[in-house]
């Protein structure tokens, strides 16, 4: 079910508590409370070192107080209490954050103390969800917080920070305002239909819709690069059996992740792992060797390998340079490169340490295959730094994309914008056909709702649940 959200008064909900820092041994940990009776609950268990009789409810916001937590007469810990008053807190509710000593036992004691005194254990992402529902952040910014927490590369982190700052929200807000204006003018016409009044000429509307289509199309197109920043560059290592694909995966990762054997066909299914080079994350996939086989399990592995190759942003074809008779394999390389024209393609010639005239063979290989070939020895770790640099250069500028413009990085946002673009296209076609105003207004309203879904102006409970369940309990 969807509903339109607007500016609502701050709602103080039931008090929730959670540990906001990772469980483990450390110097400090944070346990937070938020809700209508947060100050009352904190006041029952916390005594200030100075002026112990002054309740926290009487202290100003944005203040820190040293004191002790007690369970009755039993000392739990010495803590710092940070006070945040509604509406000037993260959730817009009254909040208290206790900074206690780190360690799982003491942290759990502090949390249990708050639960025993009236708090409910927060659900995953509930603090952020309350911030969204109380208008402190929009849905895009809430998602950006989650993306920043889960970021695995510098590029993903920087992109999340920019989204959290509100750049994409501002772009979509301006887009929504234009849509809202056109919708309002058309609906005014419907209200005054008996008077045959045009509040916006059809030519002006046509120009406006064309401009909106262009803006939406730019955002849709940006997803192709934006997803690489957050998801990483899908990099598939392909080639014949026993070319050294698993050894190369292990060498790039710096760990023994894949089983390595001299027996062909050891890898039966693909293996995925990530590594970061020059701030760019690569999602490496080691695939089963490409060959015709009657063995059922290996045949399925080859089928899955080809499926992953079709999804690759960067395809590394690994060739055993020490193997005799490369002519047939070169034909396969040429065919693969043509079949995966949308992917970056690099031939990696392995086992150069076993070939005396490796440089000559590499030149010949590059000429006959019609593409660049780079020589390595995965086992001896020769040429690996050069390979990593070449991989980064093939996606050059990716780490700076987040600085250049507003990017769409989420599949949810991408699909909503595609739907908005379809609705705008329908509206433009209806205009060309001189269709009824009501039909044009319907399509513009649909586009408006799709854009609203991204920022949370239009709320779908299933979407909210899917977004916030990914958060940790204390966020």
From Swiss-Prot:
Which InterPro entries does the record match to this protein? G_TrmE, GTP-bd, GTP-bd_TrmE_N, GTPase_MnmE, MnmE_dom2, MnmE_helical, P-loop_NTPase, Small_GTP-bd
Q: What is the E.C. number?
A: 3.6.-.-
Q: Which residues bind (6S)-5-formyl-5,6,7,8-tetrahydrofolate?
A: 32, 97, 136, 475
What does the entry list under GO cellular component?
cytosol
Q: Which cofactor does it need?
A: K(+)
Where are the annotated coiled coils located?
none
> What's the chief localization of this chain?
cytoplasm
Task: Report the co-factor binding details.
Answer: Binds 1 potassium ion per subunit.
Please state the span of the N-terminal signal peptide per the UniProt entry.
none
Q: Which UniProt keywords apply?
A: Cytoplasm, GTP-binding, Hydrolase, Magnesium, Metal-binding, Nucleotide-binding, Potassium, tRNA processing
* Chain positions recorded as Mg(2+) binding sites: 246, 267
- What's an example of a GO molecular-function annotation for this chain? metal ion binding
Enumerate the residues binding GTP. Answer: 242-247, 261-267, 286-289, 377-379
Q: Subunit structure, per the record?
A: Homodimer. Heterotetramer of two MnmE and two MnmG subunits.
General function of this protein: Exhibits a very high intrinsic GTPase hydrolysis rate. Involved in the addition of a carboxymethylaminomethyl (cmnm) group at the wobble position (U34) of certain tRNAs, forming tRNA-cmnm(5)s(2)U34.
> What family is this protein classified in?
Belongs to the TRAFAC class TrmE-Era-EngA-EngB-Septin-like GTPase superfamily. TrmE GTPase family.
Protein name per the record: tRNA modification GTPase MnmE
From which organism does this entry originate? Chlorobium phaeobacteroides (strain DSM 266 / SMG 266 / 2430)
